[in-house]
Amino acid sequence: MGKALLFSRGTIEMPNNIRLSAIRNVIAIFLLLTLCATAIGAGEYKPVFENSADFPLMGDWEGKWIDPHAGHEKHNPELAAQLVCLTQKQYLVRILPKLNVRSVPYLEVKANVKDNMIVIDQAGWKCTFANGTCKGTGRLHGKDVGIELKKVERLSPTLGQKPPKGAAVLFDGTSFDAWQHNDGRKVTWSLLKSGTMQTVSLFWDNKQNQKKGLGGDIVTKEKFDSLKFHMEFRYAVEPGKRGQGRGNSGLFFHGIGEVQILNCYGTPGYWNECGAFYKHEPPKRNAAAPPLQWQTYDVEIQLPDKNDKKTKALVTVYLNGHRIHYKFPMSYTGNDGVSIGLQDHINALQYRNIWVVSHPSK
């Protein structure tokens, strides 16, 4: 049993050794809390938009089976992989028959990265991803078969497309003149020296921006009839984030609906993921590119006649050159055209080269 506390005149007195120990503990706790607060402030989460060399394994890989002995692969030995950054030290490795199609992976495993290298030795697969190549063996129809893959960068065919004559340029990298916040405020997003805009969040987790009145969705000042629209965007590397918590934004055609923007690289492409009419219709394929890579949305909208309240708008969407919706019918609730919006949804997104060609509805 420890020493008893001494009571005197209704107060508690402690022996000197206990008193000094208690004081030391209080000081230690105070210093710990101070250091934690400092660390939290200094280590505030920042998305990674640059330094792709820090993620040399992330992205698309293409190659083939070497002399497959049976099955479809004997006639078409095509092979592909997606390496998805989960954390600074762990990746999701998906080995597939082909990129941008919904297919059952040959292999889908989590693997650690060390010295810019991933070594797979799981489920009968033995291969190494390093320096832009992957060689080894995979399990195919009960046998070990050689594989070889190379890192590839597949860019959208419409990347950098210039606005045609007569187009309304919504963003050329110099100003936000064509935009405003939904509540009419001047745009408070960031205009970067690179000629891109970057979201500034007014979301629930950013109290400072809320106090300063910064951030929030933006929308075009002008409305448009039937249109052809082009935009380029990219999301950051956000290690540790998952699902709707990474690369989340949205492309809105007000009066019709939202085309989702989301870092869903390496996912099936559900109805709430990139390319979907959000929680309405999934894309025909997941054509989302890996983080850091510039991507394109090309959208065509045919609005019904202004006096026609029954016919729906027809929407065609291309993501990175892949047609993911074709003349999909969407209810149109407007009567004087559509404004175009970009969503603030916590995450940092970048946009550039935004333009639209509008023509009267038939």
Question: Model regions: which residues?
Answer:
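A ubiquitous, low-specificity "background" feature that marks scattered single residues
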Residues: 9, 22-23, 31, 50, ...
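A glycine-anchored, Pro-Gly-centered beta-turn/N-cap motif
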Residues: 57-60
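Bacterial N-terminal signal peptides
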Residues: 26-38
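Bacterial N-terminal signal peptides that target proteins for export
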Residues: 5, 15-29
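Carbohydrate-interacting regions of secretory-pathway proteins
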Residues: 42-48, 52, 63, 67, ...
